[in-house]
Amino acid sequence: MKRWICLSFVLGVLLGVGVVRSQQSVTGTQRIVQFENDDVKVWKSVVVPHAPLTMHRHEHGRVIIALQGGTMKIVDSQGKSEEHVWETGKAYWLPPNAPGTMHADVNAGDQPIEVMVVELKKDK
């Protein structure tokens, strides 16, 4: 319960932060850690158009908050892909990756996508 209250508070703060976007020019994909403790890790990602991220995996579920939305194409290690359309100001749940799988993310749009990611370190 305590963890969910903390997560709800963090999400509320992050949604407020999403209203004020950085005016800096983005030249490459960035991942900036915002906060980390024993329960969660929070980072901001700025994903430039058409530049695939390296293959990686997520062991735990996470919430994505779109600060600047767009369409993210997610390609798994077998070549299967799916698209996620993230609207600015909205939050989305992404479950942990299946055991033994990896994926790469590609911004399918023409503008950078900015998201805040809140990843749980313990699923239960």
Question: Which residue stretches match the model-derived regions?
Answer:
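Ligand-binding loop in jelly-roll beta-barrel domains
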Residues: 98-121
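A short glycine-rich, His/Asp/Glu-containing loop-to-beta-strand
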Residues: 28-54, 59-64, 117-118
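Positively charged n-region of N-terminal signal peptides that target proteins for export
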Residues: 1-4
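Glycine- and acidic-residue-biased ligand/ion/polar-headgroup-sensing regions
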Residues: 58-78
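Histidine-centered metal-chelating micro-motifs
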Residues: 50-54, 90-105
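Short acidic-glycine-tyrosine-enriched beta hairpin
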Residues: 35-39, 78-97
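Bacterial N-terminal signal peptides
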Residues: 6-16
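Sec/Tat signal peptide C-region and signal peptidase I cleavage site
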Residues: 18-22
